[in-house]
Regions:
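Mid/C-terminal beta-alpha module of Rossmann-like enzyme folds, strongest
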Residues: 135-193
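Glycine-rich "substrate-gating" loop/helix at the edge of Rossmann-like oxidoreductase active sites
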Residues: 61-64, 92-102, 118-130, 144
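Conserved Rossmann-fold NAD(P)-dependent oxidoreductase catalytic core, especially the SDR/UDP-sugar
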Residues: 9, 18-65, 87
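Conserved catalytic-site region of short-chain dehydrogenase/reductase
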Residues: 4, 40-50, 94-100
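NAD(P)H-binding glycine-rich loop region in Rossmannoid oxidoreductase-like domains
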Residues: 1-15
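Active-site helix of classical SDR
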Residues: 68
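Substrate-positioning beta->alpha
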Residues: 71, 104, 120-141, 151
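Conserved beta-loop-beta element that borders a ligand/cofactor-binding pocket
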Residues: 74-97
Length: 193
């Protein structure tokens, strides 16, 4: 369950970790030969690293959703170390059509359009759900061989600096969007609220 609602923090954590252990743990116990676990790029995002990759240590997170993904990832890494054939993906913000409800990333786009799009030295990284589905199909058709601990893949999609994302959203909506320069530390602090 993807929820950043602090009122649902405990439920989000328990659903994500418990559900993952039930499904992935059972698949390993049953001897399934190819398993794909969808983690989140958020488990690798942390200060002190100029660049992250699949070997970056797991982040210490406070927010329930990210913490549930981190703890689930830690569990899956333990399964990989014991030889369970799990391939792990780390998608960035997932966006795309036919969203049955407004996902967190699509909700962010709606806020950028209706309220404000930030302008910092960073940007927004997202992956189209159709591209992510294609990557998962490929992994299911091509089981990991050798060291399962190497079977971890960042699926980043596209990175848009804030000014470029603003231009793209203005082109799609046909209107000028409000943008406000925000210092990076202030913007990150806002994300923790």
């Amino acid at each position: 369950a993807v929820s950043l609602d602090p009122r649902k923090a405990q439920q989000t954590y328990e659903n994500n970790v418990g559900g993952m252990k039930a499904v992935i743990g059972s698949a390993c116990d049953l001897g399934i030969r190819n398993i794909v676990y969808v983690s989140s790029l958020s488990v690798l995002m942390q200060t002190g690293f100029d660049e992250i990759n699949e070997t970056t240590p797991l982040a210490n997170t406070r927010e329930a959703y990210s913490r549930s993904k981190r703890d689930s990832d830690e569990y899956v890494r333990g399964l990989q170390a014991r030889g369970c054939p799990v391939q792990v993906t780390y998608p960035s913000a997932i966006v795309g059509p036919d969203d049955p409800k407004l996902s967190e990333a699509n909700h962010a786009f709606a806020q950028f359009i209706s309220q404000m799009i930030p302008n910092t030295t960073t940007g927004f990284q997202c992956v189209d759900v159709r591209d992510l589905a294609e990557a998962h199909r490929y992994l299911l058709e091509h089981p990991a061989t050798g060291d399962f601990e190497d079977a971890r893949y960042i699926i980043g999609g596209h990175y848009y600096p804030w000014p470029e994302l603003r231009q793209k959203l203005e082109a799609v909506t046909g209107r000028r969007l409000f943008s406000l320069p925000i210092p990076g530390p202030v913007f990150r602090a806002m994300g923790q609220v």
